[in-house]
């Protein structure tokens, strides 16, 4: 939502210094019912004054404040009288710019650390235990606080783990309160948002719907919008939201590119066209996509090809329809950050943001690009969408094209479809579908020796990926009961052709991403 869509909300803005965790800070603030959004670190004090936030948070980042070209801040921000919280690099930047000292640490800290609160009157730590476990990730540290500040927490390797200047409402923490590994991170951010910033929890999904519909109507006017339905939750929610806003001005194209899950094409048509009355044109483009993917093994090239083909199909269908001015997409906040902001390292290009050609003929509408996945599900339920559709498994824009590692062929796609269907059946049968955030199978592309019956086999391996998460920014592997995993494995090797081995991925995010490609 643009700023003029948020004037009635109390806001806390987060300045981006390049941390892959920075979106988590905005998510944590939103969980309190306070609107939060990431802003570039280059934002000026004058621009901040127009936004009129209740508070400002400087995010962490991978650099040193002494690096050549180190990311800075408009120092007039410190004169606005707005509470500021510096996190990790943000604390070091605050200390340096206000007259303190920052030096390289003798012992860098990455991971869990124990801190001790040194001042019982510190507002960030009000009513919290003196000893706490936090998540550190830093190579520099503050060695002397600026004038007017005091140390409020310490650790063995970081003597100044937190600091504050309560008179000016400036606060710094060397650790990451936004991640789950910090024991009282939720409470620390809550203290900053409510006790220090005095923000009110007046942002809700109902308000988002009302304002976003108004925004869509104002932007689109009497023009027409084309939506690409992928079969996933995000584009489906966009379709229902747009239909609610502009009705028959929306035309949806559902591209059956041959990269969908088992039975998915029929489910999408029945749910959205049947229940909600969306005008959906179904295009069978399977041969086109698989033909263009033939011989391609590089994951980035596959994503670009799939994204390119999507846009080409849209262009062709739009030419038949005449008068299409806008293209709608289900881009989420997490899509944007994983494709890299101006200060964050690009992890992978997303289909919704990285595959668009420069000569795009449509104006883009991305009504979900400020929302996280769980917020999109909440939005879908508020719009009256079926629970089964809203809570279906997250599905990447490139579909099964990035769950077949290496070259994509019809035979390999069938292996992934069948194994994934078995996994979803078993997870639901054991009542785990609400506890596991995302689960799917992947075909790594290598073969291994096995024995089935009296014969030797040399067949494919299937990987199972099941993770727990809140918003997809960080994730841990799901601790599925061994008996359940054994049952899933047994069914896959017995029911899916050309598979003789099943492995379970137990890697967290980071260091891995959720998808394998």
Curated annotation (Swiss-Prot):
InterPro entries per the UniProt record, alphabetical: Class_I_gatase-like (IPR029062), GATASE (IPR017926), GMP_synth_C (IPR001674), GMP_synth_GATase (IPR004739), GMP_synthase (IPR022955), GMPS_ATP_PPase_dom (IPR025777), NAD/GMP_synthase (IPR022310), Rossmann-like_a/b/a_fold (IPR014729)
Catalytic reaction(s) noted: XMP + L-glutamine + ATP + H2O = GMP + L-glutamate + AMP + diphosphate + 2 H(+)
Pathway: Purine metabolism; GMP biosynthesis; GMP from XMP (L-Gln route): step 1/1
Keywords from the UniProt entry: ATP-binding, Glutamine amidotransferase, GMP biosynthesis, Ligase, Nucleotide-binding, Purine biosynthesis
Keyword check for Endoplasmic reticulum: no
Sequence ranges assigned to domain Glutamine amidotransferase type-1 in this UniProt record: 11-202
Domain GMPS ATP-PPase as annotated: residue spans: 203-392
Residues at the catalytic site: 88, 176, 178
Keyword Amino-acid biosynthesis included in the entry's annotation: no
Binding site for ATP: 230-236
Entry EC no(s): 6.3.5.2
Any one cellular-component term (Gene Ontology): cytosol
GO molecular function: ATP binding; GMP synthase activity
Subunit details: Homodimer.
Protein task: Catalyzes the synthesis of GMP from XMP.
The protein's name: GMP synthase [glutamine-hydrolyzing]
Species name: Lacticaseibacillus paracasei (strain ATCC 334 / BCRC 17002 / CCUG 31169 / CIP 107868 / KCTC 3260 / NRRL B-441)
Gene responsible for this protein: guaA
